[in-house]
Amino acid sequence: KYFGAAFGIAFLVCSIYVVNLFSSKPFSLDHYLAKELIVNLVDSPEYMTYIGIVDFLNPITKHNSKLSNTTLEDSEADHIDTIKHLQILNSYADDDLTEDQIITKKIAVFDTENDINGFENFRFHSYPINQIGGAHLNAVEFMTDIHPIRSKREANDYLKRVNQIGASMDNLLLWFDKQAEIG
């Protein structure tokens, strides 16, 4: 009887915490930044493979068979998310934070403002491909050096990823077209 009540209360408390964590601004800056880190990690199948600690979840997430394929529209949506991220960071009052959290907040705000400034003012100013590095070589290096092939499933995932490289490069070519259009 007491076990059931304790379990119910624990489940309720955990549910409230998770809802708060993912629905809006968590109570703690540390929890918010940890959530953002995890969300960004899960958003990139390459990062999930690189880290490797979530490979046991691959049958569910299927991250080892996917590549990030960022379109121009995805970049716009990410930019809007970054602006929202900055607003949430700034909504944490320094008076409610510890000294360490204030420093962490300043670093996070600085980094986020740099991301926003870079997107708004220098989005198409880089050279993502050149003769010694870039997206084309990163794809090859990732597939040869990082993607694990320890089983038949991972070999099949490897082939699925290889088949997605063309679409990823096509989006990069669209980025170049937009860069040329802007001048």
Model-found features: residue ranges?
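Short, hydrophobic alpha-helical membrane anchors of single-pass surface/secreted proteins
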Residues: 1-5
